[in-house]
A protein has these predicted regions:
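Domain-level signature for soluble enzymes in the chorismate/prephenate branch of the shikimate pathway
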Residues: 2-182
Length: 182
């Protein structure tokens, strides 16, 4: 999207951040949904339950596995910690403690971390799904109008999931009684 190959897309804020595109794409709206809930997802630093690691400072010189190298390196830099960060091709939560000292993984509910006897030390980034556009496309009035329509449809569909539509065939004279029952 940022390169202009696509006018718009839907992705997690975490991937906009991971790829260095914050401010380089136009955020049209936030779409509050994820795999299991409508809550944001979190990139968390996790260690085995029996690990002596209690804070980010304890990661000095340690090995960390993650699918989000950029997020982790930025986090470590902000906290003045030097550690080895290696890319994980999936199943990150099973790598600690045998292969690495800590992991950084995406969690929505924490159930996978708990199932693998891991505890969360810190949350590095909270992310939600975003509808984004190429900045040049956003400035084009015709494209922007279509993107605004898509925004309305997407947000409307998500909002509709939280509502119930009830239709009822009843004589007009019983309207007050029907409303009381509902």
């Amino acid at each position: 999207v940022e390169l202009g190959l696509l006018d718009a897309g839907i992705c997690g804020y975490d991937w906009v951040y991971e790829n260095g595109n914050v401010g380089k794409v136009q955020e049209i709206c936030e779409l509050n949904y994820s795999k299991a809930t409508t809550n944001p997802v979190r990139w968390v630093l996790a260690v085995p339950n029996d690990s002596k690691i209690k804070t980010v400072k304890d990661l000095q010189g340690k090995r960390i596995s993650t699918e989000a190298i950029g997020i982790v390196k930025n986090y470590l830099k902000k906290n003045h910690v030097k550690a080895d960060v290696e890319f994980s091709w999936g199943a990150t939560e099973v790598k600690a403690p045998e292969l690495v000292d800590a992991i950084v993984d995406l969690t929505e509910t924490g159930s996978s971390l708990r199932a693998n006897n891991l505890r969360i030390v810190d949350t590095m980034l909270t992310s939600t799904t975003r509808f984004i556009a190429n900045k040049k496309s956003w400035k084009n009035a015709a494209k922007r109008a279509k993107l605004e329509q898509l925004k309305m449809l997407l947000t409307g569909a998500l909002e509709a999931q939280r509502r119930v539509l009830l239709k009822c065939n009843a004589p007009a004279k019983t309207l007050d009684q029907v409303v009381k029952v509902m």
